[in-house]
Every structure is written in structure tokens, then in C-alpha cells.
Amino acid sequence: MEDVEVRFAHLLQPIRDLTKNWEVDVAAQLGEYLEELDQICISFDEGKTTMNFIEAALLIQGSACVYSKKVEYLYSLVYQALDFISGKRRAKQLSLVQEDGSKKTVNSETPCETENEFLSLDDFPDSRANVDLKNDQASSELLIIPLLPMALVAPDEVEKNSSPLYSCQGDILASRKDFRMNTCMPNPRGCFMLDPVGMCPVEPVVPVEPYPMSRSQKDPEDAEEQPMEVSRNGSPVPVPDISQEPDGPALSGGEEDAEDGAEPLEVALEPAEPRTSQQSAILPRRYMLRERQGAPEPASRLQETPDPWQSLDPFDSLESKVFQKGKPYSVPPGVEEAPGQKRKRKGATKLQDFHKWYLDAYAEHPDGRRARRKGPTFADMEVLYWKHVKEQLETLQKLRRRKINERWLPGAKQDLWPTEEDRLEESLEDLGVADDFLEPEEYVEEPAGVMPEEAADLDAEAMPESLRYEELVRRNVELFIATSQKFIQETELSQRIRDWEDTIQPLLQEQEQHVPFDIHIYGDQLASRFPQLNEWCPFSELVAGQPAFEVCRSMLASLQLANDYTVEITQQPGLEAAVDTMSLRLLTHQRAHTRFQTYAAPSMAQP
């Protein structure tokens, strides 16, 4: 047992180190497993009958499928039986109810025996606790509800926010307007009614002030707004207000009584007597609709903190911000021409020198030293400024190079470049002030007595650091990349991967050099090696002297020929005795596809 645990330690405990996975020889273990399977044999009748694992697995799978089908069929039968019993009980119950109703019309005193009903799982009776309603009470009035009650109309968001419903912890759960119990009238019998049926649908119009101050307006939290109710005959009726007294309408002086905390009197709901159509036609329809007051806005609202990551609505109107006037900068005329201007401005006849304009404008004031060091502060002038500075530096380098040559060769090249010398002298006069505002670190004076061979080094030193920094960085990066490619630190895992690549690469190249495999060509070659028809020939003799991959290809071709009935395959009986005893017999030289082309069915043959 210990040998097995040591052998399969990598399977029992997962390897966390990735490099140790390369130490597991998967091919050797698979080979040993196949050898063990080859040695295991389950046979019956002294080796004559062997167990076929594939057939056994298919048998188990088929048995499971058949059993599952039978269980499913039994399940459906049970449900059909339950539906049949429930339907039969329901039909019997309906017939009993109809007979019971007919008996009540003839003789209401005869009791009706109730039979135990079949209890269905999905048919639960309605719970009517604390409700005493008579089902046999026939109403003489015609119940018509032409309008939707206001209690069923969904309130607005403003009304919901005006009366929030808080939990014990102080969290806002919902609005008190969401629950119908808060807007319904309790009936003396125990149920909640949406309409005040106990009140008369026609009430005399009471002259009141246009906007009386009632308790509901004083304290909106205690007395919420009651919506307009609709009676059963279709006419709107006023809802009883807690501030009104039963004797008469509320007077204007009732405000003080309401503020003093007088308890409201309960209004007794008396059942209205049924009226005939003639009486209702004679009475004048004097009623008024109660005005629905707007929801009062809360005094203090929580200031919502805006979400900075919330996406903006493209159709929303943004807040108008106050225009802040900035500091404008005007470009001198003639420096830059603005395209697309219809109005032609009269510019300067001659282009003004930028360097002279800059010195006159900024270098002569008292704080000129600071301005000269920092340069211009205009973003539009940056390009022109640095371009001009670059031209000045190039001119200074050429002038220094010329002076060095004249110092070491005084008489050789005096008359060679008069035009360039004159031009350099003129530029030197113009650049006399340029040395003032340039940084002292940008150029270095050459010492006297410098050799001509060192002129290039002096030019490199005289070049400003800002201009050669980019070139220096590029050279350093290229040098670093070139050196880092030579000294790459190889880890243990990369070294093993490289060894594996060195091992597998020759095998892959060898396989790429093989001839492409065509099973029909190999089948023709195998058929041509048979000496004659109907003669058994061992497979080892047919593939003698061929490499391993050619033997495998010939094996596949022989199986294809056996499938086409071109050859016949046989072996010796027994499991161990049948190893390497495969023999083939050629049945026909004609290929399968040619036989199928010339094949004629017996039914199509002419008599």
C-alpha cells in the first residue's frame, strides 16, 4: 500500500510548484496502466467466453433509460388520476349547490346536509375572519359604479413623499398612501369599505368659506387628505371630515377648537333607505365635489449629494453659469494671418522682426531680467520663439567653427568665403542682444589654443542640453535593449521548457518530412503485396522491413479494406495466444468505389 501511495503521490496531493510537473513521466505511467489492463482478463467457461465491458456499459445505460421512462409514465398516470378525482368531486359539488339553491327558494327552513369536500392542494378557501356578511341577502338597488374610486387610483410621487412610512429603526419603507387600509372606511360588521355606503348620496350644499382652515390643513401628518368617494348609484358624495360636527357645518371659529386638541366626534353611518326612480327624479341633485388640495411640500428636504460618476442626460437642460471674462491676447498684425475673414484689415507693409519686437516689448521694462529668463508666456508664440532660438544657436555654432578655422589657418582661406563671412558678421550684429536673454549654461566659450581635431567635441559641448537630451535618451534606450537581449536571466522553468523544445523539435521535423497519408493509396499498396487471391498471409510478412509509422498506416488501410469487403481478417482463438497472429486474405482486386459504380440491385436486373 505504501508503494502505491508513493507511486501516485502526485495524484493524491496536488503539486503546487509548476516546475515539478515536468518531473512526472505521464507516458511511462500510461504504458504501465495499459499493460495492467492487458493482463486483467474476466472470462467464463475456461476462457471461451470473455466479458465485453462496452456491451455491459450499454446494457446498464439502456436499463436506466427504460426504468426512467417507466417512472415518468407512472408519474403522469398519478397526476391524471388526481385530476380525474378532483374534476368528479367538483362536478358533484356544483350539482349539490344548484339543488340546494332550488330547495331554498321553495322552503328556506329545510336544512342542507353538507358533504365532506375533497381537499385539493391548489384550491384554498378564502379567509373571511371578522367579517359577518350574509350571502343570501338580495339588494333591491341596482349597483352601478361608473367611475373608478379614488382609493384605487395610484397617488402621485409628491403625495407619497408627503406622508412617508417609517420603520422602527427610522428607515423609510414606503408611503402611507400605498396601503388601501389607510384610505378605507371600516364597516361596523368588520370589513373595510372603499365607499361610505351608510351616507345618503344627496346632501344639501353647505355654504362654506372658499378656503377654510381645518385640522387636516393644520396638521397634515395626523389627518391625511381623503380622496373623493363615489357612491354605489354613481353620484359623488362628500367624505365625512373629522373636523365637522354632526349638527351642522364647521364654522370659521372652529380653528381654535381644532388647535386646542378637541377630539373628533364619530359620525354614525346610517343605512340609506332605498329610493324609487320617481323620488330621485323629483329631488334636486344638489351636491358638490370636494376640492382636492395639493400636497404640501415638506419644510426641510434632505439635500441630495450629486453623484459625480452619474452619466448626463443629453435632453436635460443644464444650469446656466455666469460668464467669466478671461484675459485676451492679441496677436500682432502680420505675424499670423487669420483665414476666412471677410473684412480685410490693413496690415503692415513689411513683416516686423519677431526678435526685435520681443525685445522692445518685454526686454526693456524694469522687470525685464525675469521675463528674459522665462521667455514668452503666450502659447501661440511658443513655436515661433523656439524656432528663432534654434536658428540663433545654429548661427552661433557656425560662427565659432569659422573663428576656430581662422585661428589655426590665418592666411590660407581668407579670400574663399567672403559672402558667408559678411553674412555671419551681419547676423552677429543682430544677435548681439541674443546672448543676454539666453541661459549661461546653453553655450560654453572655447579656451584659446584649441586644436582643430577637437572642434567637433567643442561643438558637441556647446550644443544646449535641451536640444540633445532627446537624442541621448534614444541612444541609451537602444543600447539598453541591445545589451538586455544578450543577458536574459533564465529561470529553472524556462530552462526545462527549452530542453523539452530541444527534445520534441527533431521529432516534429521528422514527422513533417513524412509523406502525406492517403488511406486509398496505402490500401492499393497492401493489396498489391498479396501473391494471389483467397490465400491467407500474415500481416507481419506484408509489412516486414518498414518503419513504425508505415506499419501503423498499413494497419489502418487493412481495416478500411476489411470494411469494404476487399480483404478478410482473422486471428487465433484465445486472448494471449491471439497476440501478433493477424492474417489477411485478399477477396478481390477490384476497388470498392468501382464495384459500387457497376453494382446493380437484383430487383433492377432484367428477366
Curated annotation (Swiss-Prot):
Stretches the record annotates as Disordered: 211-312, 325-347
Record InterPro entries: CNDH2_C (IPR031737), H2_M (IPR031719), H2_N (IPR009378), Ncaph2 (IPR031739)
Gene expressing this chain: Ncaph2
Keywords noted in UniProt: Disease variant, DNA condensation, Nucleus, Phosphoprotein
Modified residues (Phosphothreonine): 19
Superkingdom to which the source organism belongs: Eukaryota
Name the UniProt record assigns to this protein: Condensin-2 complex subunit H2
Compartmental location: Nucleus
Record-level GO cellular component terms: cell junction; chromosome; condensed chromosome; condensed nuclear chromosome; condensin complex; intercellular bridge; nucleoplasm; nucleus
Complexes and interactors: Component of the condensin-2 complex, which contains the SMC2 and SMC4 heterodimer, and three non SMC subunits, NCAPG2, NCAPH2 and NCAPD3 that probably regulate the complex.
Species assigned in the record: Mus musculus
Signal peptide (UniProt feature, chain positions): none
Reported disease: Defects in Ncaph2 are the cause of the nessy phenotype which is characterized by a specific defect in T-cell development. Nessy thymuses are smaller, with corticomedullary junctions less well defined, and cortical cells sparser than in wild-type. The thymocyte defect is typified by an increased proportion of CD4-CD8- DN T-cell progenitors. Only thymocyte differentiation is affected in Nessy mice and not cell differentiation.
Principal place of residence: nucleus
Chain positions found as Phosphoserine: 95, 231, 235, 252, 494
